[in-house]
Amino acid sequence: MKTGIVGFGHVGKLMKKTFPESLIFDPFLKLGLKEEINICDVAFVCVPTDMLENGDCDTSIVEECINWIKSELIIIRSTVPVGFTDKMVEKYKKRIVFQPEYYGETQDHPFNNVSRDWLSFGGEPSSVNLAIKAYQLIINSEVKIFQSNAADVEMAKYMENTFLATKVTFVNEMFDIAQGLGVDFNKAREIWLADPRIGRSHTFVYEDKRGFSGKCLPKDISSIKNQAANGKVNTLLLDAIVEKNFYLSNKNKK
């Protein structure tokens, strides 16, 4: 099965490690040709979905790629709003699956390779089965494979990143409270983390880089807030997290 990767940024480069024989197309880096992608059975779309000025997710590059890709299956790795994949299937009449990426931005992120023990795919069952077929060439049978409709999986990705943003914000607030009470935060943190329900990830506090930042968490919490507003759902908790993170980011400037 021939695979192609559209977009050779952080996610695209890690996808190349996962599927080393893949053809690459990235017009900004002047890599490859569209025609090479179009002879592939599966095309992975790994392009940016940056935050627009109004806080929405910019899906224009993803849609542009879907428009011209002629591969039998398109797998969207970029984070997109809930319902986007289904809209693209309806509009372009193509086989499209959403597969969230979990690569993270740190050098030693635990999901930077195919050793992760789960994969998730969202889309029509026949399209999802084709995506799984591609991965079965590189994974072992111990890997759990979750399948659902695209909207469920899109929502799960936003839940993940929003939860991590919430956790970072919570830990930063506990850090400030500990300092205010004359408590050693790091000692308290280790005692807290002894409870296996908590989980150690995203519990460091960097005194010179407070709050959450990067390419994913800020844009994704903003996007899901806007999506909720469109559905007339209040987001008091998420609003407070964004406000607190703004406060923390201003601390970084002092």
Residue ranges and their predicted role:
Residues 1-42:
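NAD(P)+-binding Rossmann beta1-loop-alpha1 motif at the extreme N-terminus of oxidoreductases
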Residues 3, 21-25, 74, 94-96, ...:
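Hydrophobic anchor at the start of a short beta-strand
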Residues 19, 39-40, 71-72, 93, ...:
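Short, well-ordered alpha-helix to beta-strand connector turns
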Residues 47, 79-157, 224:
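Rossmann-fold dinucleotide-binding core
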